[in-house]
A protein has these predicted regions:
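C-terminal and inter-domain tail/linker signature
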Residues: 2, 9-142
């Protein structure tokens, strides 16, 4: 038994054409849905079944549409700036800065999306927090 693992293509995740298409589709979807707040433009990027793990959003494509309507009505000036994007096979991870929801409040979000074989988004998780004015380390979140 060896603890040494030779480098394989899986180690260099994010380099395949499929992975790059997955990342591009998620970024396009994110901008159309969360920045443009245009469900019709974002819908083609979603699979027929959309599993939502955010406890504040409903499951399914219809649930996502309701979320976009809510966002458009309650936070019309919100903007999500993707700071970093990573892909590993069928998962795309975004590191996002959100502004324009509450005066003086910036949010940091990690969004994780799973895509299917047709490069459609079929599952979503996220973790969010307010960006503090000061950090113990002195380092920013972005």
């Amino acid at each position: 038994f060896s603890l040494f693992c030779p480098l394989t293509p899986a180690v260099f995740a994010g380099n395949s054409d499929n992975e790059q298409l997955n990342k591009k589709n998620v970024i396009d979807f994110y901008n159309k849905s969360l920045n443009d707040k245009d469900f019709a433009a974002a819908r083609p990027y979603l699979g027929d079944r959309y599993v939502q793990h955010n406890p504040m959003a409903k499951d399914g494509v219809a649930g996502f549409e309701q979320f976009i309507v809510f966002l458009k009505n309650k936070y019309p000036d919100s903007h999500s700036e993707i700071k970093q994007a990573f892909v590993d096979g069928d998962h795309v991870i975004l590191h996002v800065e959100v502004t324009g929801r509450e005066p003086g409040v910036t949010r940091a979000i990690i969004d994780i999306f799973r895509v299917d074989e047709q490069h459609k988004i079929v599952e979503h998780w996220d973790v969010t927090q307010n960006v503090p004015q000061k950090t113990a380390s002195g380092n920013g979140m972005f």
